[in-house]
Amino acid sequence: LMEHLDRLEDGDVLFLAGSIPASMPDDMYSRIMERMQHKNIEIVVDATRDLLVNVLKYHPFLIKPNNHELGDIFGVELKTRESVIPYGNRLRDMGARNVLISMAGEGAVLIAENNEVYKAPASKGKLVNAVGAGDSMVAGFMSGWIKSHDYETAFLTGLACGSASAFSEYLATGKEVEDILNQMKGESK
C-alpha cells in the first residue's frame, strides 16, 4: 500500500475514508499521513472519532464529520447549524485546515481555512436513499474546489452532490446535481 501511495505526485488528492480493515493497524491513517507529509498533495479524511482526531496533527486539507460524529468526539449533542460551529472550530484548532459538517435534513456547515463559515439548509427534495450521500458531498466539494479554488463554490457543489445522491435511488446524474446547484444559487440571491 505504502509503495503505491509513494507514487502520488504534487497536486494529487488522497481520500482516506471509512473504517480500517481488521487486518491493518489501527493507526493506518496516521501512518499514511505521516508518510505523505513531504508531498504537496491534498488529503481528505472522512472517518469517525479516533481515526479522525489522530490525523489532525498532520493538517488534512478537509475533514468531513457529520453532526453526530462531531458531537461524539466532544461528548455533546449537536442538532443545529449554529451549534456545530464552535466544535468545528476546535477541530480546526487541532489541525484540520477545512471542516465540512454534514447534517442530513439540517443542511451543512463549512468552516474554511480562510476563516469564513459557510452555512446552508438542506436542499428541497424527497429523500430516497441516504447511503453514500456523505461520500458524494465530499467528492462534490473536492470537484468544486479543484475547478474553482473557491470555498463557497466547493461547499455548494458538495451540498448539491450529496443532496442529489440522497434524492436518487443510486448515484445522482450530473444533470440532477446541476439542477440542485442552480436551485441553491437561485435561492441565495
Model-derived regions, located:
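Conserved phosphate-binding/catalytic region of the ribokinase-like
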Residues: 34-38, 53, 81-189
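Conserved phosphate-binding/catalytic loop of the ribokinase/pfkB sugar-kinase fold
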Residues: 1-10
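Structural motif
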Residues: 12-13, 98
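Conserved beta-alpha-beta core of the PfkB/ribokinase-like small-molecule kinase fold
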Residues: 13-82
